[in-house]
Design a protein with these regions (language model features):
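N-terminal, charged/glycine-rich beta-strand/loop interface patches
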Residues: 1-254, 265, 269, 329, ...
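Short gly/pro-enriched beta-turn/loop segments at secondary-structure junctions
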Residues: 249, 256-260, 293-297
Length: 432
């Protein structure tokens, strides 16, 4: 029987797909409360995890079938960690097969996904239980430890001495959920950039639906997923699977935060809505490769849209996050526009803003894929999409190397046919 609200505090081993056992189902219109654990660095240095994240296991949604879509309304997000550590990575030679996020092994005894123990602090604190050698497949070339003051809304990076003190109490500062199995990266004790202040503006790097193929959770996107094509490890996929089965759940788009609406494709029965990889803050692009991963509590509300067969997520960000030309028309503006149109003898096209996600191995390929996806969704030529994006939208970088948001003012008559008009009108309080 479907539940009106589900608490999800259970995590994958780094792999997500049709094999992953789902919680639920949650009722159509119900809520999911996710207790998330940090993504990126903690899972990256944990030898037993088979992906670059440790996302929550998916939740089935009542009535969701392949070929439908699920509307995910992001209601709240609370940062739980007291500190975070991040930086630019460098893989350790010999500590992986093909992909250091996925196919980890001890660089000395060659044991795949070795059991481990943490001894002391520092970048070599994670040791293989079998032979005793340092076993993390990554080092942090330049990194920082940041203390977070959620009440005041900012964080400050600390010096090496304070970072070492935090490392000694890594579990306390990280506030990992009880069922998380990662090593908190705070044990590294990095303090290369002290005294830097940043505003806390949290969001989820992972929020979406389950892909139709079993893959590492961090690779459920068109950029990282590209590395799985014919890869030399058990999670290799074909180019056809790459193009067909991924759902772009790993966006790292900083507008996936409270007040946003994400509309995601259903590619397995029940949709399998999952979350993870919460960040305390991030500028467009996540140019360092990683940012301030934190444990968090997120609440979303879900609703099934029957027959809306999507290739990729559609994002309705908070209005203040929209680029200037994509912002919704307000009543006074619209009345003036109608008057001007009457003077010209024209009929105005009612429109609404939305963002189509583009993804690919490079940022240019991601943009082109975003245009193609928007073309298919809206039933217009790629050339028309490009013209509309140019004068009523924008292309924004979500993550390097290959996630973009293609903003466009889409004709309302088309959104009505898709079953999206009411959702967008209510979200942006449009004057139509």
């Amino acid at each position: 029987m479907a539940e009106s609200e589900i608490l999800n505090d259970v995590f994958t081993n780094g792999v997500i797909g049709p094999h992953t056992r789902m919680l639920g189902p949650v009722a159509d219109g119900g809520r999911i409360k996710f207790l998330t654990t940090p993504g990126c660095w903690g899972p990256m240095i944990t030898p037993t995890l088979r992906g670059g994240h440790e996302v929550n296991v998916p939740v089935a949604v009542e009535g969701a079938r392949v070929g439908d879509a699920v509307v995910v309304r992001f209601e709240s997000l609370k940062v739980l960690s007291k500190a975070s550590s991040s930086g630019v990575d460098k893989p350790v030679e010999g500590a992986f097969v093909g992909d250091p996020y996925v196919a980890k092994r001890c660089p000395v005894c060659r044991e795949p996904w070795p059991e481990f123990e943490v001894v002391g602090i520092g970048q070599e604190a994670v040791h293989c239980k079998r032979c005793g050698a340092p076993a993390s497949p990554f080092r942090m070339v330049h990194g920082y430890t940041m203390l977070l003051d959620q009440a005041r809304g900012f964080g400050v990076t600390v010096d090496a001495a304070k970072a070492a003190q935090v490392a000694e109490r890594a579990a306390e500062y990280a506030q990992l959920p009880p069922k998380s199995r990662q090593v908190p990266v705070l044990v590294f004790g990095k303090g290369d950039m002290p005294g830097v202040a940043a505003r806390v503006r949290p969001f989820l790097g992972q929020l979406g639906s389950t892909p139709a193929v079993n893959i590492p959770d961090s690779h459920n996107a068109g950029d990282f997923g590209y590395f799985l094509i014919d890869a030399p490890h058990p999670y290799s996929i074909t180019k056809e699977q790459y193009e067909r089965d991924l759902t772009d759940g790993h966006l790292d788009v900083d507008s996936v935060r409270p007040g946003s609406v994400l509309i995601v494709p259903v590619k397995v029965k029940g949709a399998g809505i999952y979350a993870g990889d919460a960040h305390a803050m991030q500028g467009d692009g996540e140019v360092a490769g990683h940012t301030t991963d934190v444990a968090a509590e997120a609440v979303v509300q879900v609703e099934v849209v029957k027959g809306l067969n999507l290739e990729c997520p559609i994002l309705l960000p908070p209005e203040e996050d929209l680029p200037p030309l994509a912002k919704p028309w307000r009543e006074e503006e619209w009345e003036e526009l109608k008057q001007y149109a009457r003077e010209l003898g024209l009929e105005l096209e009612e429109s609404a803003p939305l963002q189509v996600i583009g993804s690919g191995p490079t940022i240019n390929e991601a943009a082109e894929r975003g245009f193609a996806r928007a073309s298919k969704l809206l039933g217009m030529s790629v050339e028309e999409v490009k013209n509309r994006v140019t004068i009523t939208g924008a292309v924004e970088i979500g993550r390097l190397p290959g996630i973009v948001q293609v903003s466009i003012q889409a004709p309302l008559r088309i959104l009505e046919k898709l079953g999206l008009a009411d959702i967008v009108i209510k979200h942006y309080r449009l004057p139509y």
